[in-house]
Amino acid sequence: MRDLKTYLSVAPVLSTLWFGSLAGLLIEINRFFPDALTFPFFSF
């Protein structure tokens, strides 16, 4: 039961950090490449 409580307290923290960093990454990509349907660093 203690392991379940540990999991339930760790999972929201990790998911918040993950989604927060993902949102920050997407915001920075949109700041440097606004309105990009295809990203310039993938084109040859």
UniProtKB/Swiss-Prot annotation:
GO terms for cellular component: chloroplast thylakoid membrane; photosystem I. It is a single-pass membrane protein. It is found in: Plastid, Chloroplast thylakoid membrane. Keywords: Chloroplast, Membrane, Photosynthesis, Photosystem I, Plastid, Thylakoid, Transmembrane, Transmembrane helix. Pfam families: PSI_PsaJ. One of its GO terms (biological process) is photosynthesis. InterPro entries: PSI_PsaJ, PSI_PsaJ_sf. The keyword Isomerase does not apply. May help in the organization of the PsaE and PsaF subunits. Belongs to the PsaJ family. This is Photosystem I reaction center subunit IX. It comes from Lactuca sativa.
